[in-house]
Amino acid sequence: MLIIPAVDMKNKKCVQLIQGNPDKKHVELDNPPEIAKKWVEQGAEMLHLVNLDGAINGKRVNDEFIEETIKNSGVPVQIGGGIRSVSDALYFIEKGAEKVILGTVAIQNPKIVREISSIVGKEKVTVALDAKDGKVLIKGWTEKTDYSPVQIGKILENMGAGSILFTNVDSEGLLEGINVLPTKELVDNLNIPIIASGGVTTVEDLLKFKEIGVYAVVVGSALYKDMINLKDAILASK
């Protein structure tokens, strides 16, 4: 199981938000490219890069800054935030991203997943599913749909998604531990890799995800607040 450090960028700083709220931050640090490099030096085999400005504004911004982070990291990078079109996705793949992460746009228009995966290959297309109380959320967690993660996950899998990044919003950013059951439902019902995210605070949390068969876990706040040592986490997850 891969451990993927999160490098969330806002206003050219590295931040960790509480429950996705731009006004509530656990962490705010300068120089995201250097932070990305630090995680790689500690053993990260992949990085999770999120352009929060792009996610909030609904369009690509800070392209050059993101390119620098991708280019200098030395490991595969999955990038999300503000990717709303086929051309946005292709842009980041051409700039060296290993995977692009689609959010609301893929849930509202699943055909875009098929279009992108037919060009770059499904292994390069990840769709982010965020859920609260068993229902998928869209538009930055501001709207709740009537559908479960498994229902939407199956549609996205059929459309050519190569993996699902699943965030249990009930746990995200609170540093209170995890509930693996919603993630396990996806692992049990889909045939593509599931990347788990949200609420990890201990190596024991990571082992719970490993037990249910997730492909990777994105870890953010717990790394930045020194609740988890990255080297220990990687060792435990092998």
Curated annotation (Swiss-Prot):
<dbReference type="InterPro" id="IPR011060">
    <property type="entry name" value="RibuloseP-bd_barrel"/>
</dbReference>
<dbReference type="InterPro" id="IPR006062">
    <property type="entry name" value="His_biosynth"/>
</dbReference>
<keyword id="KW-0028">Amino-acid biosynthesis</keyword>
<keyword id="KW-0963">Cytoplasm</keyword>
<dbReference type="InterPro" id="IPR044524">
    <property type="entry name" value="Isoase_HisA-like"/>
</dbReference>
<feature type="active site" description="Proton donor">
    <location>
        <position position="130"/>
    </location>
</feature>
<comment type="pathway">
    <text>Amino-acid biosynthesis; L-histidine biosynthesis; L-histidine from 5-phospho-alpha-D-ribose 1-diphosphate: step 4/9.</text>
</comment>
<dbReference type="GO" id="GO:0000105">
    <property type="term" value="P:L-histidine biosynthetic process"/>
</dbReference>
<dbReference type="InterPro" id="IPR006063">
    <property type="entry name" value="HisA_bact_arch"/>
</dbReference>
<dbReference type="GO" id="GO:0005737">
    <property type="term" value="C:cytoplasm"/>
</dbReference>
<dbReference type="InterPro" id="IPR023016">
    <property type="entry name" value="Isoase_HisA-like_bact"/>
</dbReference>
<comment type="similarity">
    <text>Belongs to the HisA/HisF family.</text>
</comment>
<keyword id="KW-0368">Histidine biosynthesis</keyword>
<dbReference type="GO" id="GO:0003949">
    <property type="term" value="F:1-(5-phosphoribosyl)-5-[(5-phosphoribosylamino)methylideneamino]imidazole-4-carboxamide isomerase activity"/>
</dbReference>
<dbReference type="InterPro" id="IPR013785">
    <property type="entry name" value="Aldolase_TIM"/>
</dbReference>
<feature type="active site" description="Proton acceptor">
    <location>
        <position position="8"/>
    </location>
</feature>
<dbReference type="Pfam" id="PF00977">
    <property type="entry name" value="His_biosynth"/>
</dbReference>
<dbReference type="GO" id="GO:0000162">
    <property type="term" value="P:L-tryptophan biosynthetic process"/>
</dbReference>
<keyword id="KW-0413">Isomerase</keyword>
<protein>
    <recommendedName>
        <fullName>1-(5-phosphoribosyl)-5-[(5-phosphoribosylamino)methylideneamino] imidazole-4-carboxamide isomerase</fullName>
        <ecNumber>5.3.1.16</ecNumber>
    </recommendedName>
</protein>
